[in-house]
Amino acid sequence: MKGSFKRLIAIFMLFLHIVSLSDRIVPDNGVSKNLQVDKAANGVPLVNIEAPDNNGISHNVYKEYNVDGRGAILNNSKDLTNSQSGGLIYGNPNLQNSSEASTIINEVSGVNRSRIEGYQEIAGKKANYILANPNGIYVNGADLSILEI
């Protein structure tokens, strides 16, 4: 009986670990060299997007892009700004030598579909937003806010 209980706990812990890994935003650093995922002071994931090209397009590639109930902030601000879901956040260091993006493309290169179960916010300059995942996008309770400073 003791051995069976230990095995059951071990299996449970393994699946718990797998489920928790799927709730993340993971950059594909082989493609997006400067894309950074951090956290706001309250723990909400904070994405410092790539600098835009000459057309104002910030192309960001992820192995995984999932937004849980806490939400996520896409930082499109050069300066300190107040976000709705994370409070005050620092300017995006990737934008210090460029302008803010007019379009943000979030592309998923991994094999899993994206799960969007929370609020996504573009903090800083207003921008068009595209989420592309060839494996699919599951949306439940999602919202998108585009704030302009």
What are these regions (language model features)?
Residues 21-149:
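Solvent-exposed adhesion/ligand-recognition segments of exported proteins
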Residues 1-9:
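Bacterial N-terminal signal peptides that target proteins for export
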Residues 10-20:
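Bacterial N-terminal signal peptides
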